Structure formats: C-alpha cells, structure tokens
C-alpha cells in the first residue's frame, strides 16, 4: 500500500487516557516500519452547562458544570500491510473514540 496515508483521530474526556492510547498507536506503527506524523493536539472542546441549584425559586443561585473533549490527530505515512493488521488487532481503552480515514 505505498503512497497512501492513514489518518487517525482520537477523542476522549480524559487526556491521560488519550495520550496513553496515542502512545500505543505510535509504537505499533513504528514497530511495523511505517512513518508517523504526530500526535498533533487539536483544540479542546469545552461544553458548559448552567443549572439552577434549587428546584423552586432563587434563580441567582446556579451551578456550572463543564465537560472537556480532548482530541489528537495521527498520520501514518506509507503504511504496510503489517501496519494495518497490527492496528486492527490493537486493543485500546473504552473511553477513547477512534476515527480512521484511509
């Protein structure tokens, strides 16, 4: 599969778990002889939610929650068939969302 590129995009709420998964992917790709570009940190998405503390009155009393979505991008350049097989067999954590584009 010469002159191709695999683009892997990872998302997670926990950045430590995300970096661990990125490290596993990069090590697997380098071990099989492919060139790796990245990991590239993409902007973190912050969703903020504001809710009332009490169920009835007192609108001035509110509570704010936020959830951060961390993202990373990895490009695998010149992947071999061994690289694709190793990536398919790789078992990542449950809290990491993986999108792969060929």
Swiss-Prot record:
Gene3D superfamilies listed in its UniProt record: Ribosomal protein S10 domain (3.30.70.600)
Domain of life, per lineage: Bacteria
Gene Ontology molecular function: any one: structural constituent of ribosome
Pfam families linked to this entry: Ribosomal_S10 (PF00338)
A biological process from GO: translation
Keywords for this protein: Ribonucleoprotein, Ribosomal protein
Entry-linked InterPro entries: Ribosomal_uS10, Ribosomal_uS10_CS, Ribosomal_uS10_dom, Ribosomal_uS10_dom_sf
GO cellular component, one term: ribosome
Cited function: Involved in the binding of tRNA to the ribosomes.
UniProt family annotation: Belongs to the universal ribosomal protein uS10 family.
NCBIfam families found in the cross-reference section: PRK00596.1, rpsJ_bact
The protein's assembly and partners: Part of the 30S ribosomal subunit.
Record protein name field: Small ribosomal subunit protein uS10
Source organism (scientific name): Geobacter metallireducens (strain ATCC 53774 / DSM 7210 / GS-15)
Organism lineage: Bacteria, Pseudomonadati, Thermodesulfobacteriota, Desulfuromonadia, Geobacterales
